[in-house]
Amino acid sequence: IMLPNHAPLIVAEQFGTLESLYPNRIDLGLGRAPGTDPQTSFALRRDPSRANAFPNEVVELLNYFHPQDNQKIHAIPGMDLDIPVWILGSSFFGAQLAAKLGLPYAFAAHFAPTHMYTALDIYRKEFQPSQFLEKPYAMLCMNACAAESTEEAEYLFTTLQQSFTQLIRNDRKLTPPPIESMEQYWNPYEASQVSQMLKVSAVGDFAKVKEEIEEILRKTEVDELMFTGVIIRQDSALLRLSQK
């Protein structure tokens, strides 16, 4: 949830509803970015200045789940439910906030890996134990695209590469089908930018992807991994998800 787009009370009640329907299966991740283009942000009635209030709104939301003494407003459902709340981020700000509040931290390496190691280090060094966690707990989100062969995986991965190129061009469209080669699609600048944005990606046959994932775990020592994979062919996507 990009919290500046929503009222904390509404988020608490919505996730309280989900937790009531599916106990112990719901986590809530909170970010401060708009998460969309300016036009959509405006349609959501987003106030650009609300990003500055993000730390206070996180605390407000936590208090709806765990009410303070003499608190007048309550989330129903939501109150007294144990819903894990994560701080999402790709910069030092989120790492420091998660550490200060003693919350788990999820780093968005799937599109903004530049500060990955430093942000995780800051989070761990500055972490303050809380009612939620006794010690730091971190997750890394990364891209993964596995196939029977590395060639097929690289072919399928061009869908995501094209999408990120469109983002750089400010020309976002529907998810494109894969293409045989990116050489004719992007220019050198775009290739460099997209490659940096997608740097934390495991692409290849199943053995290669497994090896690359294990390497990321060794380097980051995160507690959990979350994978994202944009595969436009349903049969291929289902196959990839079914592989261990």
Residue ranges of model-derived segments:
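Flexible, glycine-rich active-site loops centered on histidine and acidic residues
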Residues: 4-66, 105, 113
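Active-site mouth loops of central-metabolism enzymes
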Residues: 1-8, 79-89, 147, 197-206
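A conserved active-site cap/scaffold subdomain adjacent to cofactor or substrate pockets
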Residues: 93-114, 119-120, 124
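Short glycine/threonine-rich loop-to-helix capping motif typified by GTGT followed
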Residues: 149, 235-243
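Active-site beta-loop-alpha junctions enriched in small/polar residues
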Residues: 1-3, 31-35, 90, 110, ...
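Aromatic- and glycine-enriched pocket-lining scaffold segments that form the walls
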Residues: 51-104
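An alpha-helical appendage that flanks or caps ligand/catalytic pockets
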Residues: 48-74, 115-222
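Structural preference for beta-strand elements that scaffold enzyme active sites
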Residues: 25-29, 84-86, 104-106, 137-139, ...
